[in-house]
Amino acid sequence: MGKNIKVSFKHVSKEYDLYQNKSDKIKGLFMPKSQKMQSFWALRDVSFDIHDGETVGLIGINGSGKSTISSIMSGVIPPTQGEVIINGETSLIAIAVGLKGPLTGYENIRLKLLMHGMKSSQINKLMPSIIEFADIGDFINQPIKNYSSGMRSRLGFAISVHTNPDILVIDEALSVGDQTFYEKCVDKINEFKARGKTIVFVSHSLGQVKSLCDRIIWMHHGEIREMGTAQEVAQKYDEFVKWFNKQPNDYKKKYQKEHKENQKAPQKKIYPNPNANKYRLTLFDKIFLTVLIALTILFGTLVATGKSFKGLISEESTTQIEKVVHVDNYDLKLN
């Protein structure tokens, strides 16, 4: 293609342990790998390249692995097997990802931009533009936990596009909200495309994917079923959906059950992860990392809100502090 590769997945697989309860999860920390609980392969041997300036769509039925790919691509979770190469800074736009419920919209903006390494002067300069783009009115000064899903998506999108990422990953963020905001987002996406940015667009809407994307990757129960031009793959996927919807309910249930059972089967071929040592943590490492992340988020919250630790406790209560420092977007049970 003659363009630099921005994202490369090489034989990537992602395994999750299927715990029945919290006690099983704790036991899993101490059990050797040979005695692990039953697992589920969300991805199996996935390989693709995305080039500089491309807009690539990820489509597939629920549970096909689309969001797992976007999370790995954004650095939220690591792969279990294979190699992932990202050349540039990635920003993930998904409903409520990275937004802290107890904080106001204004405070979330400051916190997110601080975590992107921006200085206070840069944040103050961007703040009016972000608030205007989000267009949520007086709710900007209300806690995120009181927002609708559409308002969360608006704010998340507004923040992410103002961080000027090299690679923009949009995971179902345009599935909520009104037509006016959707058109505003599409205009911003087209602006990014004109600037040569790389965009990965995850959606169930074939119309959106066909109009915005150059290529499509069709994920099906953790594997790539088709990959090619937007028109070709969208047509094949549309034909599959229409065929599947015509089948009797008993057949649909059997079809889905068989494929999900296959995803529980052991991986037939093992592809080593060149960064395995980087991802493999001891129990002490996991505890230390959890505390470190919690303190980092707490410190960022204090800076974003301009409050002291004592003031935050008295105003929000100890329960709210626990919510602020709760790390819900990290998979510390690394395989």
From Swiss-Prot:
It catalyses: ATP + H2O + teichoic acidSide 1 = ADP + phosphate + teichoic acidSide 2. ATP binds at residues 60-67. One of its GO terms (cellular component) is plasma membrane. Pfam families: ABC_tran (PF00005). It is a peripheral membrane protein. Keywords: ATP-binding, Cell membrane, Membrane, Nucleotide-binding, Translocase, Transport. It is found in: Cell membrane. InterPro entries: AAA+_ATPase, ABC_transporter-like_ATP-bd, ABC_transporter-like_CS, ABC_transpr_TagH-like, Bact_Polysacc_Export_ATP-bd, P-loop_NTPase. GO terms for molecular function: ABC-type teichoic acid transporter activity; ATP binding; ATP hydrolysis activity. Its main location: membrane. Residues 26-246 form the ABC transporter domain. Belongs to the ABC transporter superfamily. Teichoic acids exporter (TC 3.A.1.104.1) family. The complex is composed of two ATP-binding proteins (TagH) and two transmembrane proteins (TagG). This is Teichoic acids export ATP-binding protein TagH. The gene is tagH.
